[in-house]
Amino acid sequence: MATQTLLPPGTESYDPRFESLILFNAELELLADGFRWLEGPVWFGDHQCLLFNDLPNNRTLRWSECHGVSVFRESSDYGNGQTRDHQGRLITCHHRSRCLNRGEHDGTTTTLVGQADGKALNAPNDVVVKSDGSIWFSDPLYGLINDYEGGRQLSEQPAALYRLDPATGELNRMASDFDGPNGLAFSPDERKLYVAESGAPGALEPRQYIRMFDVSEDGRSLSGGEIFHKITPGWADGFRVDEHGNLWCGAGDGVHCIAPDGTLLGKVLVPKRVSNLCFGDRFHSRLFICASTTLYALFTNTRGVQRP
């Protein structure tokens, strides 16, 4: 049961720890509206702007405090999840071409990977870069099942979680016991990897949980994979981790804040389903929220882990 606190309207606290993470005088802001389905928010501190994808409209958009929303890329190849590598380059998951691309500083694009074991990937969904430079991404079937998010295509292999070494091109399948791997993020010390399990496409009862894996000392293998937290209503989608190790996860009724021990601390209620989010702005403490057709933001009293 939610507790009564001095939190702003539109937030619910289930644990006293949540109150220190939220500002009493900062409410949810609507930044822009009128899109179709937003995904892949990533903050560019060097340009003080947010990039995000309007997936069905096949375009990448740019938002800044001074200029609002503009088109960054007119044809995004149905880009989904995004992040930056340690050189500041944009890494994007693409549905249409079923690959992972890197945007270079000179404006060109490099395809990092499009196959596993000689077969096409499904539809890379979300991505995170580890401190050693390795790129981890989820590859479910969601982007293959309709024309709305890239075009129907046949799957050539099971849904899986991958690790890519961009220096050598070595690709390793880290886990394949998923119905639908989705958002993913490392704990601040990178000893844990959290992965959303959203279930098989079209399932009548989608999976609603986040799994937690132990990362080996060399960062090249996983163990465990037990259920860390169950999301309700809706299902776990994109999420980020803050400096305290809390997960801020997109859900059916907004953003759920989950402690490292798996406890639901509180919720930021959002009028529309949240697909993805990221921390950004000057101190990396503003939460940018992609919610269906709308972009929201909320100033918080915590900071995202300082990683792309």
Language-model features: locations:
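Blade/loop signatures of beta-propeller domains
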Residues: 1-27, 306-308
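C-terminal closing repeat unit and adjoining cap/tail of repeat-based domains
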Residues: 18, 251-308
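Blade-edge beta-strand/turn elements of extracellular beta-propeller
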Residues: 18-30, 67-75, 106-120, 160-180, ...
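Beta-propeller domains
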Residues: 20, 45-74
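Beta-rich, blade/repeat-based domains predominating
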Residues: 33-48, 75-94, 98-99, 117-135, ...
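A detector of repeated loop/turn-to-beta-strand junctions in beta-rich toroidal repeat architectures
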Residues: 57, 97, 151, 155-159, ...
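A short loop-to-beta-strand structural motif that recurs across blades of beta-propeller domains
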Residues: 59-61, 99-101, 160-162, 209-211, ...
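Short loop/turn segments immediately following beta-strands, especially the blade-tip
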Residues: 212-220, 300-306
